[in-house]
């Protein structure tokens, strides 16, 4: 029990007025005081669900399916010695520790859809939904992952890197700019909006310490601006999902109704009744999901799916972009780089991407990103392949996480002790020596790229992925 969960009396009085008649306040308070069940999502960019279930069984983990996410599971695991986040499986990117209800917005976005060519995640950090979207896109097309807080972009990038995402472009803007800067550019938009966090008390007992009705209204005003901009950035015929981890109608239903009032018949609410068995328990008359903690034993949450039926006006903006620092590699340069990569690491580049150059750095951008390159300033795009030196190319870690399958000739298998050393950023000393750059593999998963130097493999793990204690 979270006996210290703070629930302001004015908040509880408000909940009484919006709680559906089938639910009661005693259950609401009781569930708010219970810790959340831990949940994870299998990262299918790295492993199939079936293969992961086999690993989980071997490790003695008990998994229960999350009904609204085919790759999501509640997990029971002994973390007394090693936290889940420090297991080899997590550090290899095989799964993401993600609250079950936060898997729902992405499932709602992809409901009945085959594939999206371009997706905007408007408020992306720390990356749980971004990596979920990338997996459903199967690394195809372009995924713009925006985060307003500069301090959180680094964490977002580290999670994208760990999970093997290669079709993302990261930006660092207020989400209100997208309607003007990239109007009608995306097939799908996720707006998981900043909110008052009324649904998060089960993981943070102090979440409501600064709650007030005034702050709810202030946040709702920002959310209305954000949803307008997100809708303007959506292509006609496209779909968006608006979600929050809060319960107040001012931040949920009323924000969606504001969008409908602003853009009229261009806005269509699409029912989420078929998202999963049992969805009707949280369904509103508009087809939204308004989820109280006791309904599915989860966080409080809200999800709405909205279709754009017609083009709408977008604000005029005066762009000052500056010179774009990358240039597309010539056919000759591309062929040289691709041959060198194939010769040294046995890697072929995907057909839907193009090599770009910046000084001596070699990058791989998704082709679907190109129309946006002159329209928005990105902080990071695609993956870094190499740094060019006098004697050739120094290949980069993201090749290992995003392009290597494990079937390459240049793979070295290591044991548990060596894997621990590797994740701590240290060089390793396999029994047999070799030469050149190699992929390092542990228990079937590629964990990095290193280079033989005498009898050791020099560690190429980026600093942001290094862990220094309490490993598997």
Swiss-Prot record:
Judging by the UniProt lineage, the source's domain of life is Bacteria
Q: Which gene encodes it?
A: rsmF
Q: Which Pfam families match?
A: Methyltr_RsmB-F (PF01189), Methyltr_RsmF_N (PF17125), Methyltranf_PUA (PF13636), YebU_pre-PUA_dom (PF21150)
Keyword vocabulary terms for this entry: Cytoplasm, Methyltransferase, RNA-binding, rRNA processing, S-adenosyl-L-methionine, Transferase
Enumerate the residues binding S-adenosyl-L-methionine: 123-129, 147, 174, 192
User: What sort of enzyme, by top EC class, is this?
Assistant: transferase
List the Gene Ontology MF annotations in alphabetical order. Answer: RNA binding; rRNA (cytosine-C5-)-methyltransferase activity
Family membership, please give it: Belongs to the class I-like SAM-binding methyltransferase superfamily. RsmB/NOP family.
GO (cellular component) term, any one: cytoplasm
Any one of the GO BP annotations: rRNA base methylation
Instruction: Supply the name of the protein.
Output: Ribosomal RNA small subunit methyltransferase F
| Reactions catalysed | cytidine(1407) in 16S rRNA + S-adenosyl-L-methionine = 5-methylcytidine(1407) in 16S rRNA + S-adenosyl-L-homocysteine + H(+)
Where is the catalytic site?
245
PROSITE patterns linked:
NOL1_NOP2_SUN, SAM_MT_RSMB_NOP
The record's function comment reads: Specifically methylates the cytosine at position 1407 (m5C1407) of 16S rRNA.
